[in-house]
């Protein structure tokens, strides 16, 4: 669809603060509590993570805990985690989240419609939500574990054509980790037309560096793992993660 050469080139290396500025952390599992959201906000602000996401009912609380105008954005999920909600329901949820202070939204794509080949429905849904919440950016989650390679290509193309800011690999609700092989399918499809967020099973600096070389510009990482990775980056020679070569 798009020439891969149009992708933004990654930096040669990252300092710990630069790494944190590429990572979203979240408390979006069903069991997460108010205390978890408060802890999330504290960690996100202290460490300089680019975004903190909470389930919709906790977004107003999260917004109140994260200083406006700081390094950390507040986000929330739409149609989460199945993606099977109606377009009207998803749109209403997205608008409410934006009104409650969410600065970016991660929406689950309608996997069933993708697998049914109903691409027009999916395209129209994404466009409707993008328009309803503008200028708040929308990331669209594919949940790669549920899609074939051809479905990944088709879904990625739809996202790139629909005005979303990012295509995202997964919700973190499935056990499958994001792989370089699956990411390549997305990159080959979207080129530089849309940014890519990798989420799910990312646990090493080597994985981050490899994904950045492919074109990934944002990561969704378990909170404690994210903190540990920033610490590991600081402990590398020169205190920087080498993206051009290998980590450490």
UniProtKB/Swiss-Prot annotation:
It holds the Pfam family DeoC. The active site is at 106 (proton donor/acceptor), 168 (schiff-base intermediate with acetaldehyde), 197 (proton donor/acceptor). The keyword Ribosomal protein does not apply. GO terms for biological process: 2-deoxyribose 1-phosphate catabolic process; carbohydrate catabolic process; deoxyribonucleotide catabolic process. CDD domains: DeoC. It catalyses: 2-deoxy-D-ribose 5-phosphate = D-glyceraldehyde 3-phosphate + acetaldehyde. GO terms for molecular function: deoxyribose-phosphate aldolase activity. GO terms for cellular component: cytoplasm. Pathway: Carbohydrate degradation; 2-deoxy-D-ribose 1-phosphate degradation; D-glyceraldehyde 3-phosphate and acetaldehyde from 2-deoxy-alpha-D-ribose 1-phosphate: step 2/2. Keywords: Cytoplasm, Lyase, Schiff base. Its EC number is 4.1.2.4. It is found in: Cytoplasm. Belongs to the DeoC/FbaB aldolase family. DeoC type 1 subfamily. HAMAP family: DeoC_type1. PANTHER family: DEOXYRIBOSE-PHOSPHATE ALDOLASE. Catalyzes a reversible aldol reaction between acetaldehyde and D-glyceraldehyde 3-phosphate to generate 2-deoxy-D-ribose 5-phosphate. This is Deoxyribose-phosphate aldolase.
């Amino acid at each position: 669809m798009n020439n891969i050469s149009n992708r933004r080139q990654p930096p040669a290396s990252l300092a710990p603060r630069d790494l944190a500025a590429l990572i979203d952390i979240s408390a979006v599992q069903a069991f997460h509590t108010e205390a978890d959201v408060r802890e999330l906000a504290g960690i996100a602000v202290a460490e300089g993570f680019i975004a903190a996401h909470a389930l919709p009912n906790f977004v107003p609380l999260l917004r109140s805990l994260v200083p406006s105008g700081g390094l950390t954005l507040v986000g929330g999920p739409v149609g989460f985690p199945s993606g099977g909600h109606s377009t009207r329901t998803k749109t209403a949820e997205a608008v409410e989240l934006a009104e409650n202070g969410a600065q970016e939204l991660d929406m689950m794509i309608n996997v069933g419609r993708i697998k049914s080949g109903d691409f027009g429905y999916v395209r129209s849904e994404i466009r409707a939500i993008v328009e309803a919440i503008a200028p708040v950016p929308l990331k669209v989650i594919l949940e790669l574990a549920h899609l074939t390679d051809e479905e990944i290509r088709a879904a990625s193309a739809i996202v790139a054509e629909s005005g979303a800011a990012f295509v995202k690999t997964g919700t973190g609700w499935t056990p499958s980790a994001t792989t370089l092989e699956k990411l390549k399918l997305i990159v080959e499809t979207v080129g530089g037309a849309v940014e890519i967020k990798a989420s799910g099973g990312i646990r090493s600096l080597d994985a981050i560096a490899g994904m950045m070389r492919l074109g990934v510009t944002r990561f969704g990482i378990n909170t404690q793992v994210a903190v540990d990775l920033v610490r590991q980056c600081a402990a590398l020679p020169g205190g920087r993660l080498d993206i051009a070569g290998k980590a450490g």
